[in-house]
Amino acid sequence: TTPLPVLVADAFAYHERPGALQRLTPPWESVSLESSDQSLHVGSEVVLKTRFAGVPLRWVARHTEYDPPRHFADTQVSGPFASWNHHHEFRERVGAQPESGASLTDLVEYELPMGALVDFCGSSIAQRKIESMFAYRHRVTADDLQLIARYRSAPLRFAISGSSGLVGSNLTRLLTLLGHQATPIVRSKGHSSSDENDCAIAAWSDASEIEKFSDVDVVVHLAGKSIAGGRWSEQGKQQIRDSRVVKTRQLCESLATLKRKPKVLICASATGIYGDRGDTVLDESSSPGDDF
């Protein structure tokens, strides 16, 4: 059980928002969404791709109870457990103000596969993993609800380069959860992941497609050659730099040709901007380094 700083109805509604499931999946878990009915109603299903003991598995969950804003439940149809039943309970906290007095309780009943031996040997490991997962979920839920309450605005259309990366994928989930439209953009067809190319609104180096950016409110530019992709040879460092400097210039020049330009362009790089600072604690107000 965890306290939540909102009304019970808002706490329940959070779980119905698009992208909530992906947002609540811990980054250390090997779980990805294959398909979803985008609903908590009885009979709706979610299909996840996961691994058990290194073996790829599909986890199919079906919603079995739906009583807004108090309760919903799901059960495993097939997957890594012998059985799994998950109940989500939303209540007012005794003595708390209604606008900040909700609580969320997750009740999980499960059985491990392959009988008593696995139950005996693996139950404590499974219990710790489940407790860690729900500690993460509860913290993210509380933080997101505070964020939603703080930034209530009309939905915006975001175009994001590098949307399949660590930062881009998490930003996309968060923006979707907040009610915005977050769509990948690519430099050119065939130069990014297949997932990005399948749903990208435009390739910014293609003059015939740049007009598609006219309907975008915000462009977030995160694309760049990975700094962890190999040894930092002189050639590799030049590629890392060019992927940020040259490609960013190309994107800006392409956007500048539009009659109706995006209102905002955000270009972000990662911790490399600060250079080698040893054990110094760094944040957005820290000065940049002077090395590569």
Question: What residue spans do the PLM features occupy?
Answer:
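Hydrophobic ligand-binding cavity/cleft-lining segments
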Residues: 1-41
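Glycine-rich portal/gate segments that line the openings of hydrophobic small-molecule binding cavities
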Residues: 22, 32-80, 95-103
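Beta-strand/loop substructures that line and gate deep hydrophobic ligand-binding cavities in soluble
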Residues: 73-131
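N-terminal Rossmann NAD(P)H-binding glycine-rich loop of SDR-like oxidoreductase domains
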Residues: 158-178
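Rossmann-fold scaffold of SDR-type NAD(P)-dependent oxidoreductases
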Residues: 161, 216-222, 266-268
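N-terminal Rossmann-fold cofactor-binding loop
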Residues: 185-190
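NAD(P)H-binding glycine-rich loop region in Rossmannoid oxidoreductase-like domains
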Residues: 200-250
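Conserved Rossmann-fold NAD(P)-dependent oxidoreductase catalytic core, especially the SDR/UDP-sugar
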Residues: 249-291
